[in-house]
Amino acid sequence: MTFISQVNKWFVNANVNSAAKLRLFCIPYAGGGASAFYEWSHFFPKEIEVCSIQLPGRENRGAEVPLTNLQQIVEIVAEEIQPLINIPFAFLGHSMGALISFELARTIRQKSNVNPVHLFVSGRHAPQIPCAKQDYHLLPDEQFIQELRSLNGTPEIVLQDAEMMSILLPRLRADFSVCGSYQYKNDEPFECPITAFGGKNDNGVTYQSLEAWREQTKREFSVCMYPGDHFFLYESKYEMIEFMCKQLRLVLAPKI
């Protein structure tokens, strides 16, 4: 497989903007694909290239077997991303994507001795806080679907479509297994700012659990709360984008 086809396999909209001076890598939530961030590139300045990471089992990679181990995901993506971190870069991850972005940034730091310029984590408690429940992926279908319903991220019409759910359930179980099997390990905090985004009505991710991300950086830290539940990033995306643009422009500003 050529370099270009391999990049296009894992990263959507990558290396297409010759004016880019910074890349923002976006990692979706459990069960989600790169299309979750499809429109975001339209709202960032041309100096910032917005790339979505596409994991196996999603959308155009739907025929591939989903990965069920976070470390395996991180090791593969950390290798594939190397040609794209030739300019400053940042991560945005939502829910499961926040956990992946955190461990991916750690692995890149270890392998390449470079930090992202900013880590944006969304809809996920700090990694050092154990999950209250880790075995969602082992639940019978009916109970598992009820858990999905409580998160309010899957339309009811889809949850009630047996044929559609037969396609989605293996992917969703794989992703919940990724989160449920995660084991946090202590390491040095990052030398980059971290921003934690949360939904004011997200009962599963409290302000306090977002505030705990502070332990993971030696630099600036902030929590931004927006209207909405666990999937607030849809109704509050413009506010999130405005905040991220402001933070990333600080990186691009000429040093005097």
From Swiss-Prot:
Gene3D superfamilies: alpha/beta hydrolase (3.40.50.1820). It holds the Pfam family Thioesterase. The active site is at 95. Pathway: Antibiotic biosynthesis; gramicidin S biosynthesis. InterPro entries: AB_hydrolase_fold, TEII, Thioesterase. GO terms for biological process: antibiotic biosynthetic process; lipid biosynthetic process. Keywords: Antibiotic biosynthesis, Hydrolase. It comes from the Bacteria. SUPFAM superfamilies: alpha/beta-Hydrolases (SSF53474). Its EC number is 3.1.2.-. GO terms for molecular function: hydrolase activity. Belongs to the thioesterase family. Probable thioesterase involved in the biosynthesis of gramicidin S. This is Gramicidin S biosynthesis protein GrsT.
